[in-house]
């Protein structure tokens, strides 16, 4: 699949880092530049109803050859995470034979002691960074895999298929990917995001997510005359965070365990803000975490009545499991497609969110499929080419199997 590798290496040269501080959609001009290039490519491929709107949402259709088959969607996002993403220079480690991988010309290393799963890829071709940027496999690998699968279906009209809708979204990494998704021009019965990790991942559960800002307002007085009058908001914030459960943080949890994560803090004597993210798979656990924060704020306010402590909670997205379970055939079809591609399905929860989570609540059930990548959002990101090829085969098999499904 030379075209797959060529596509991916071309796509990662586009600088598409999203910008959470910019309220515009898309939040960065590079995403529109990439979207226009993809739009041209899809038109040249011969897809129908190729549409790129002012917000950077790109949709197209591969018409089916089975009139009664359900229409499905394949979705990926164009932006990359909040990490250095300009001037990406991939390196290809052909026929990996084990051991550490030097990244570029510096001292950065993809070390086997840190990533023991590297041993699973002996003899394969690994695409890595040069140690100075992320790679962008999240989610340009998904885009390359989708379009390569579409290429294969175009070249093999004997493969039965219903309509296949393709959607590429902006700003997924900053939680806005579904904000303006054009469902009116995306008439799929259900869809799949191709935005997962290692080979075989199949996900239809994700975190419930919220953000919490705790604002501490104190009283700044000259420190030489501060006795009895200064209220140092930073001290209060430190007390607050020190009382948070250390066993319920991202670095101490996995699987179905939720957490509180102090993502950012800034402050002065007068005013300090702590910005947390709250994650839990269980609805009751999610509600309990938010209640726990409220109780902690109220308790500290009683201890420091001369200060003012304010809590703002904002829900971000919800666990899509409740929206997928009434349509479990779409998960079973994905499992069968992986097995047909000689891939072992690995059903696991997403310790994060995807566009598909919100789209599922908008009426488009949307589980998540693997891309094959590892270590997303940083300089140690890499992806095995053979896993990408398996993703393409899985998508082709998914289209074929879905063409025979009648609900």
Swiss-Prot record:
Cleaves the N-terminal amino acid of tripeptides. It holds the Pfam family M20_dimer. Belongs to the peptidase M20B family. GO terms for cellular component: cytosol. Its EC number is 3.4.11.4. Zn(2+) 1 binds at residues 77, 138, 195. It catalyses: Release of the N-terminal residue from a tripeptide. InterPro entries: ArgE/DapE_CS, Bact_exopeptidase_dim_dom, Peptidase_M20, Peptidase_M20_dimer, Peptidase_M20B. One of its GO terms (biological process) is peptide catabolic process. Binds 2 Zn(2+) ions per subunit. This is Peptidase T. The gene is pepT. Its cofactor is Zn(2+). The active site is at residues 79, 172. Zn(2+) 2 binds at residues 138, 173, 377. GO terms for molecular function: metallopeptidase activity; tripeptide aminopeptidase activity; zinc ion binding. It is found in: Cytoplasm. Keywords: Aminopeptidase, Cytoplasm, Hydrolase, Metal-binding, Metalloprotease, Protease, Zinc.
């Amino acid at each position: 699949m030379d075209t797959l590798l060529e596509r991916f290496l071309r796509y990662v040269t586009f600088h598409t880092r999203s910008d959470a501080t910019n309220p515009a959609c898309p939040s960065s001009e590079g995403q529109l530049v990439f979207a226009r290039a993809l739009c041209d490519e899809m038109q040249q491929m011969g897809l129908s109803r190729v549409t790129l709107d002012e917000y950077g949402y790109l949709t197209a259709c591969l018409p089916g050859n089975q009139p009664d088959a359900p229409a499905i969607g394949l979705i990926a996002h164009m932006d990359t995470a909040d990490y250095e993403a300009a001037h990406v220079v991939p390196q290809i480690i052909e026929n990996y034979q084990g051991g550490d991988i030097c990244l570029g010309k510096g001292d950065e290393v993809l070390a086997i002691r840190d990533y023991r799963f590297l041993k699973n890829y002996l003899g394969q071709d690994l695409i890595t960074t040069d140690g100075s940027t992320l790679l962008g496999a999240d989610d340009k690998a998904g885009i390359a895999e989708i379009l390569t699968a579409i290429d294969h279906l175009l070249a093999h009209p004997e493969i039965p298929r219903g309509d296949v809708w393709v959607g590429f979204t902006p700003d997924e990494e900053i939680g806005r990917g579904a904000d303006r998704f054009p469902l009116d021009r995306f008439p799929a019965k259900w869809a799949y995001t191709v935005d997962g990790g290692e080979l075989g991942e199949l996900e239809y559960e994700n975190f419930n997510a919220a953000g919490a800002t705790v604002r501490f307002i104190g009283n700044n007085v000259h420190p030489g005359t501060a006795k009895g009058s200064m209220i140092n908001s930073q001290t209060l914030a430190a007390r607050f965070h020190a009382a948070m459960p250390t066993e319920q943080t991202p670095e101490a949890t996995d699987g179905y365990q939720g957490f509180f994560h102090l993502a950012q803090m800034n402050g002065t004597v007068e005013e300090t803000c702590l910005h947390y993210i709250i994650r839990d798979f269980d609805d009751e656990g999610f509600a309990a975490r938010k209640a726990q924060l409220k109780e902690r704020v109220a308790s500290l306010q009683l201890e420091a009545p001369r200060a003012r402590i304010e809590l703002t909670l904002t829900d971000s997205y919800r666990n899509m499991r409740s929206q997928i379970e009434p349509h479990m055939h779409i998960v079973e079809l994905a499992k069968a497609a992986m097995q047909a591609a000689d891939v072992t399905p690995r059903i696991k929860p997403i310790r994060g969110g995807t566009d598909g989570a919100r789209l599922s609540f908008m009426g488009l059930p949307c589980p998540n499929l693997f891309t094959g990548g590892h270590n997303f959002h940083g300089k140690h990101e890499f992806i095995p080419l053979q896993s990408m090829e398996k993703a393409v085969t899985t998508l082709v098999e998914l289209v074929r199997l879905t063409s025979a499904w009648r609900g």
